[in-house]
Amino acid sequence: MIKKGALTGLLLFGIFFGAGNLIFPPSLGTLSGQHFWSAIAGFVLSGVGLAVLTLIIGTLNPKGYIHEISQKIAPWFAIVYLVALYLSIGPFFAIPRTATVAYEVGISPMLSKNMTGIGLIVFTTLYFAAAYLISLNPSKILDRIGRILTPVFAVLIIILVILGALKYGTTTHQQASQAYSASAFGQGFLEGYNTLDALASVAFSVIAVTTLNQLGFKNKKEYISTIWVVGLMVALGFSAMYIGLAFLGNHFPVPAEIIAKGNPGVYVLSQATQAIFGPTAQIFLAAMVTVTCFTTTAGLIVSTGEFFHKTFPKLSYKVYATVFTLIGFVIANLGLNAIIQYSVPVLQILYPITIVIVLIVIVNKFLPLSKIGMQLTVAAVTLISFASILGQQFHIAWVSDKVNALPFAQASLPWLVPALVGILLSLFLPNKQKSERFEIES
C-alpha cells in the first residue's frame, strides 16, 4: 500500500509540477501586499484544490472525461470542449509559456538588455527544434529525466523558500495592486487559473487510470483509498510550496519599474536565487528550469498531437506535432507577459465550465440527475462566462452590469450560484441518470 501510494504520488506530482507554475505564486505575493492571506487562499483553492479534485474524479471513470461529458451533456460538446482544452494546455498557452519561462527565468538574467530580443529567438529555435525531434520519437528517457529532475528541482525550491523566509520574512511588503485591493480572494482565485493544472487534469486523467491499473490493486476500495490519500498529500505539498513562494514574493524587495512591467514573479525567482545562493547559482537555475520546462513541452506536444490524431485521424500524428510545434514557437516569441495576457480571457471561460462539469460528475456519483438539467446548467455557466469576458474586454456596460448583479460577482464567481441552482433543479427534472459504476481491471 505504501509503495503504491508513493508511486501514485510521484505520478500526480509529475502531472502537476511545472516550472511555469513557479512564477505565479511570487507574483501574487508581490501584488497582493497587505491582502496576502486572502489572495493566496483563493490561489490555492483554484490552483491546487480544483486540480487535485479534477484528477481524482477523473480517475474514477476509466473511460475519462470524454465519456462523462458525452453521456451527461452531449458528444459534440465533449469534442468542442476537449479541443479547446487541449489547445489551451498545448500550442496556444502551455507549450509556448514553458519555453518563455525557461528563457525569462534561466537565460535572460545572464544577458544584456539589448540582447534579450534576439536571445529569445535563438533560444526558442533551439528549444523547439529539440522538443520536436523528441516528440517524433518519444521515449522513456524523457519520462525518466522528468521523474528525476522534477523532485530535485522541487526540493531546491523548498530550500529557497525556507532560506528566503528567514532572510526576508521581516521585510515590509509592497502595497497591494488595485485588483487585489478590490477583491483579494477573487483575484487570487483567478490567478490560480494560470497554473492550467485543472484543465491538464481533465486531459491526463486517462493516463493516470492506466498507470494506476498497472500497479495491481486488489480491489476497488484499495484503489479509491490510495487515490484520496495521495491526492491529499499532493494537495498539502503543493499548497505549502505555493504559499512559501508567494510569501517570498510578498517580502522580497521588487523595484516599482519591475512591477509596472507585469508579472514580477520571474524577477523574484531569479533575483532571490542569486541573493541567497550567490551569482553562480543563476547558471544552475537556468539548467534546472530549462530541462524541467523542456520535458513538459515535449510531453505536451506528444499528448496534444495524439489526442488530435485520435479525434481527427485524417491527418497523421507527425503533421499535428509539426503544426503544434510551429504554433508554440511563434507564440513563444511574443514574450511571457503577452502570453499570460491573452490567455486570461480563455481561461476565465474554460475554468468555470470545467468546475461545473466536475461538480456535476461528483453529485451524479451519488444522486441521479436530469440530463436536460445538466445541459442547461453547463449552458448557463458557459453563457455567463462568455458574457463576463465580453463585458470586460469590449467594455460593454450593460453586459457587465448584468453579470455584476449576480451573487459573488465581486469575488469573480458570478457563475457559482446559477451552477448550484442548476444542479439542484436537475434533481427534480425528468430523464434522470446516474454515473456508471467502475471496476478495477484485472
PLM region descriptions:
Residues P91, I95, A154-Y180, A198-L199, ...:
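Hydrophobic alpha-helical segments and their helix-loop junctions in multi-pass secondary transporters
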Residues G9-F17, L163-T170, A179-L245, F284-C293, ...:
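Hydrophobic, membrane-embedded alpha-helices of multi-pass small-molecule transporters
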Residues K167, S370, M374-S442:
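A generic transmembrane alpha-helix motif of multi-pass inner-membrane proteins
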Residues L60-G64, E68, L126-L149, Q214-F217, ...:
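Membrane-water interface regions at transmembrane-helix termini and the short interhelical loops
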Residues G49, L53, V152-G164, I227-P253, ...:
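Selective recognition of specific alpha-helical transmembrane segments in multi-pass small-molecule
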Residues Y65-Q71, M241-F294, P345:
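TM-loop-TM module centered on a large, flexible mid-protein loop between adjacent transmembrane helices
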Residues S135-G164, S343-I355, M374-L383:
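Membrane-interface loop-to-helix entry segments
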Residues N137-I148, F185, A208-G237, P255-V268, ...:
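Hydrophobic, small-residue-rich membrane helices and short re-entrant helix-turn-helix hairpins
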